[in-house]
Amino acid sequence: MSTPFLSVRDLRVHFSSEDGMVKAVDGLSFDLDRGKTLGIVGESGSGKSVTNLAILGLHHPDHTEIEGEILLDGQDLLAASERELERLRGNKMAMVFQDALASLSPYHTIGKQIGETFRKHTGASKQEARARAIEMLTKVGIPQPNLRVDDYPHQFSGGMRQRAMIAMSLVCDPALLIADEPTTALDVTVQAQIMDLLKDLQQEFGTSIIFITHDLGVIADIADDVLVMYGGRCVERGTKKEVLRTPQHPYTWGLLGSMPTLEGPVDVPLSPIPGTPPSLLNPPTGCRFHPRCSFTEQVGGDRCSAQQPPLDLVSGRGAACHLTPEQRAEFFTDFAGTRAN
């Protein structure tokens, strides 16, 4: 069995606050192979972005407690010095943030910002960095890149700024790209263009991608494997086909039930998940989803509120739920029938 390119084991990220310790990520484990895309999906506050900022080493050490293990190509990132992390960021691993306008400096041209990353990690001259910036703008589909390289962020449209951010992230050919909801603020046409761009660039460079989103439709388009997060924990894992076609966790059923489908009748109402996400300052005991779950009675007793269900994986597939496999199959059949009728 080959060693995964990225391995995260029992990751815990807790933040200190005036009111206590916020358990933003609490015991998360996953692997990512070379050239593959892992989609991490969940509601706001589920721990998606916190996880990936921990991988990049971007949490403030004075207010954050991080435990566990993060291995990137065999290197322990949690044991790395800040100088070593600075060498890795932008070079071996990079991130595309959600709001490109807020991430780009308004005082510098697009070309200078892309070239600065290239110069920092390669020692290239200004002329070489400018040529590389034009090359990357060409790769991400910016028209007239030799002219637009001297434009400022406000002169780019939203989709073009996101393309520029992708160009900046890939300028040093990183092996790992973390995309934090990069299509959320874009219209659906530009979203599709950005998704196609990421897939094309992945095929060209062999990049491993972590794609963070709350949109299962986006996951269906780009991911190879899917990790569903809730309340700082993984509640379901599997391939894209397994998670989207035969989900095993009630939370995943809820996410799917809250989305419209093209195949089903138009008069079937969407089914929102009741309640609100848990406070990670004082999270529920047992299964963190149990206060919002419709199946606690089927489990029986107080098991859901008293015991945290294990995430038992078989060939990378599993869900953290006390329902038996037979119950999951039965309830999912009912759920799928409701969606189709």
Predicted regions and their residues:
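P-loop NTP-binding/switch modules centered on Walker-like glycine-rich loops
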Residues: 43, 57, 178, 182, ...
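Charged, flexible cofactor/metal-binding loops and thiol motifs
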Residues: 239-341
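Conserved ABC ATPase signature
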Residues: 151-156, 160
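Conserved ABC transporter NBD signature motif
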Residues: 65-76
